[in-house]
C-alpha cells in the first residue's frame, strides 16, 4: 500500500508539471468546482468513503469504481491525443498512470476478496446490492462527465458513446474480478486501440531519455546483485 501511495505522489507531480508546461494558472486546480457534474463525482466518492458502510464495500468503491473506473474516461480522452500524434509526452504520463492505477485496482481487489474469504458472513445479498448500486451510480456519473467533456464539439477519432461503452466494459471487468456478475453486458472492448497503446513497448533514445517499462527481471536475484 505504501508503494501505491508513492505512485500517487508521482502522478500528482506529473500532472502538475503538465499544467505548468501548458501555462495554465494555479486556479486550474480548483476549476472543477465550477462544474456541477464534477462536484457531484467528488461528493459522491467522499460520502461513500466517509459513511458507515462496511470496510469491504469501501474497498470495492475505492479500488474497483474510483481508481479502476472513474479515472478512465479522462484517461481515454487524453490518450486519444497521442494516438493522433499530439502531446506525446502527456501520452506517456497517461500510459504510466493507467498501468499504475490498474495495479492498484488489482491489488486492492485481491485484498477485498481475501477480506471476504475471511469474513464470509459479510458476503450476502445486501452487500452485493450495495456494490452493484455503487457501480451503477459511478457509471451514471461518468456518463454525465463524458457529456460535459464533449460539449465543446467533436473529438478526432473518438465519440462520446464509445467512451461510455468503454466505461461499461471496464465496470463489468471490475465486478467480475470481485467474484460478481457483470451487469452492463459489454463483453467486447469497444476501444481496442487503448490496450494496444498501453501494452506497446517503450522505445526511447538512450541519450535523451530512459525507458520506464516495468520489468520482472529487475525483481529477481538479491540486493547484493543489484548493487554489484
Predicted features along the sequence, with ranges:
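Non-heme di-metal
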Residues: 1-228
Amino acid at each position: 500500500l505504501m508503494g501505491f501511495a508513492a505512485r500517487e505522489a508521482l502522478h500528482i507531480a506529473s500532472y502538475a508539471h503538465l499544467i505548468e508546461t501548458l501555462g495554465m494558472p494555479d486556479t486550474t486546480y480548483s476549476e472543477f468546482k465550477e462544474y456541477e457534474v464534477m462536484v457531484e463525482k467528488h461528493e459522491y466518492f467522499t460520502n461513500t468513503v466517509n459513511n458507515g458502510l462496511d470496510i469491504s464495500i469501501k474497498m470495492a468503491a475505492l479500488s474497483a469504481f474510483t481508481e479502476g473506473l472513474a479515472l478512465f474516461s479522462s484517461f481515454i480522452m487524453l490518450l486519444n491525443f497521442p494516438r493522433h500524434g499530439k502531446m506525446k509526452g502527456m501520452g506517456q504520463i497517461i500510459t504510466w498512470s493507467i498501468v499504475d492505477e490498474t495495479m492498484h485496482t488489482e491489488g486492492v481487489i485481491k485484498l477485498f476478496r481475501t477480506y471476504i474469504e475471511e469474513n464470509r458472513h459479510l458476503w450476502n445479498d445486501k452487500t452485493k446490492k450495495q456494490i452493484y448500486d455503487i457501480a451503477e451510480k459511478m457509471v451514471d456519473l461518468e456518463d454525465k462527465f463524458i457529456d460535459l467533456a464533449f460539449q465543446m464539439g467533436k473529438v478526432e477519432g473518438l465519440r462520446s458513446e464509445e467512451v461510455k461503452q468503454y466505461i461499461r466494459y471496464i465496470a463489468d471487468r471490475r465486478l467480475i474480478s470481485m467474484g460478481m456478475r457483470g451487469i452492463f453486458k459489454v463483453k467486447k472492448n469497444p476501444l481496442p486501440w487503448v490496450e494496444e497503446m498501453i501494452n506497446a513497448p517503450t522505445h526511447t533514445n538512450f541519450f535523451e531519455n530512459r525507458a520506464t517499462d516495468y520489468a520482472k527481471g529487475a525483481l529477481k536475484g538479491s540486493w547484493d546483485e543489484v548493487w554489484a
